[in-house]
Each structure stands twice: as C-alpha cells, then as structure tokens.
C-alpha cells in the first residue's frame, strides 16, 4: 500500500498539470461562449479519481482475497479455488460498477452544468475526457507496478 500512496502522489501532480493543459488547449471554434477545455479537464480529473479509487479498492480486495485463499487452502484445494474465484468476481464487478457509475455521474453532471444549447457531439467530447483520465492513471499504475515488481525481483535475487 505504501507504493500505491507514493505513486498516487506523483500521479496527482501529473493529473493537475495535464488537466491545466487540457483546459487551455482544448476549444471548439463553433461555440465561442463555452470553454469546453475546462469541462473536459474536470471530466479528466474525475476519471483519474475513479481510476485511483479502483486501484485502491482492487488492491484491498486482492490482498484480503489472497489471505483468505491461503487459509482456505489448508482445508482443500476446492475451497481455496472457490474463495479465489469469489474474490476475483467481487473485485471485477465492483470495479466495473464503479466505472459505470462514474460515467453516469459525469454525463448527468455535465448535462446539468454545461449550457443547454451546447451540441451533443461536444458533450461527448467532454465525456471522452473522463475515459482519458481513467486510462491515463491505469496506464501509469500498470507501468509503475511492473517496474516496482521487477525491482523487487532484482532485490530478492
């Protein structure tokens, strides 16, 4: 968990800098009164927060599931398999549900926040910022986790 906390500190700084870049650079000339970049940056940050929460929740479920699987393996391999399968199912459903909930919240929130005359295609571009934020954090978490794992393997040798 210490690695996740340290990684998320650096990712928070990156997210803020990248959100500022998005807010400044993204603009649609067809709607001069609306700053799509600001809305997209907010959606980007929210996607990052959802991805960070997913990573943390997934790590907690995986850690507890591994411990429970190890204890169940003392009884039988079948019990251990059931516990591992249930832990994986809970983690998968929880994380996908969190992502869908985040997407719905972004859509409803942006629909209420942006001007009513904003074209739907721009709203969809704003919502794409949510996916970009989630994907960015997931990418960095995967790469950072792989580097951490490799360093731990080298340290163990």
Roles of regions detected by a PLM:
Residues 1-157:
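Hydrophobic, small-residue-rich transmembrane alpha-helices and their short perimembrane loops
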């Amino acid at each position: 968990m210490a690695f996740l906390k340290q990684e998320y500190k650096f990712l928070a700084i990156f997210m803020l800098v990248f959100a500022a870049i998005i807010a400044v650079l993204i603009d649609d000339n067809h709607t001069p009164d609306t700053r799509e970049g600001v809305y997209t940056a907010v959606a980007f940050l929210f996607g990052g927060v959802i991805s960070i929460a997913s990573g943390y929740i997934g790590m907690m479920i995986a850690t507890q599931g591994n411990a429970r699987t190890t204890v169940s393996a003392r009884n039988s391999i079948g019990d251990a398999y059931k516990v591992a399968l249930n832990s994986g199912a809970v983690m998968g459903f929880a994380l996908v549900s969190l992502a869908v909930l985040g997407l719905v919240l972004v859509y409803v929130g942006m629909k209420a926040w942006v001007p009513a005359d904003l074209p739907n295609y721009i709203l969809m571009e704003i919502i794409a910022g949510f996916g970009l934020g989630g994907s960015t954090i997931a990418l960095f978490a995967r790469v950072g986790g792989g580097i951490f794992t490799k360093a731990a393997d080298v340290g163990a040798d």
